[in-house]
Curated annotation (Swiss-Prot):
Keywords of this entry: Cytoplasm, Magnesium, Metal-binding, Pantothenate biosynthesis, Transferase
Annotated gene: panB
Class of enzymatic activity (EC top level): transferase
Protein family (similarity comment): Belongs to the PanB family.
Reported function: Catalyzes the reversible reaction in which hydroxymethyl group from 5,10-methylenetetrahydrofolate is transferred onto alpha-ketoisovalerate to form ketopantoate.
Residues reported to bind Mg(2+): 45, 84, 114
GO MF entries: 3-methyl-2-oxobutanoate hydroxymethyltransferase activity; magnesium ion binding
Keyword Metal-binding: yes
Active-site residues (renumbered): 181 (proton acceptor)
UniProt xrefs under InterPro entries: Pantoate_hydroxy_MeTrfase, Pyrv/PenolPyrv_kinase-like_dom, Pyrv_kinase-like_dom_sf
Subcellular location: Cytoplasm
Cofactor: Mg(2+)
Protein name (database record): 3-methyl-2-oxobutanoate hydroxymethyltransferase
């Protein structure tokens, strides 16, 4: 697979071809995902839950993220690597710059930050220094305690309108991509149409520019036994892991996944 760049992603959005992203935490799965056609590998702080066994992403450290980013880089075969900046790793300007630099040096091509309009300053800071940023909006797991749990965001019209305005402001600040998690499908479609940058969804309907799932979820693996509504177990239809990942890629590209049953209404 030729190297995926921001230009590649922008071209896919303009053509209306869906972008496929999958979380990944090690070299072997990175190669397997690339061989299946996955275009973006996300080293998510979800590793705190699916690998480390925590009940949230909050305990994950920058050192954890750098270790797994470097592991994924070794197995990567052309996908764009996106790494999460973990909880409070961007609390100050100095921390934002230093921690983002560590993840870029470990092999990331883009840094993902969770938040709303207040992220604009951090996004400008990084973009001005040549670091692409993905802004993660909607249900942001690092704020789970503020939300009172893992709940759909943007169902009320005022909140939906604010999210739409926030998306525009983060694009204006220099965000290279947006990720929308657990928002009503109609709102995600509105945001996707309102911005020029690619929009990736998870639990955000089929009208975003691309999709992402947690690797363990789409393989039917769960420590807690809880399966989010937006997840499909691709192992049920395929005989092995490479085939399951290839099935996920095919389903996203064909706009067969997510189906209506995987989304949320306002």
């Amino acid at each position: 697979m030729p190297d995926v760049t921001l230009t590649t992603l922008q071209g896919l959005k303009q053509k209306g071809e869906k972008i496929v992203m999958l979380t990944c935490y090690d070299a072997t799965f990175a190669k397997t995902a690339c061989d299946a056609g996955v275009e973006m590998l996300l080293i998510g702080d979800s590793l705190g839950m699916v690998l480390q066994g925590h009940d949230s992403t909050l305990p994950v450290t920058v050192a954890d993220m750098a270790y797994h980013t470097a592991s994924v880089k070794r197995g990567n075969r052309g996908a764009m690597i996106v790494a999460d900046l973990p909880f409070m790793a961007n609390a100050t300007t100095e921390q934002t710059l230093n921690n983002s630099a560590l993840l870029m040096q470990a092999g990331a091509h883009m840094i993902k930050l969770e938040g709303t309009a207040w992220l604009a300053e951090s996004i400008r800071l990084l973009a001005d220094r040549g670091i692409p940023v993905c802004a993660h909006m909607g249900l942001t797991p690092q704020a789970v305690n503020l939300f009172g749990g893992y709940k759909v965001q943007g169902r009320e019209e005022a909140q939906a309108q604010q999210m739409l305005e926030d998306a525009k402001s983060l694009e204006a600040a220099g965000a290279a991509m947006l990720l929308l998690e657990c928002v009503p499908s109609e709102l995600a479609a509105r945001i996707t149409r309102a911005v020029q940058i690619p929009v990736i969804g998870i639990g955000a309907g089929s009208d975003t520019d691309g999709q992402v799932l947690v690797l363990h979820d789409m393989l039917g693996l769960s420590l807690s036994g809880r399966v989010p509504k937006f997840v499909k177990n691709f192992m049920r239809e395929h005989g092995d892991i490479p085939a399951a990942i290839a099935g996920y890629v095919k389903a996203v590209k064909a706009v067969e996944f997510p189906a209506a049953e995987h989304g949320f209404s306002a």
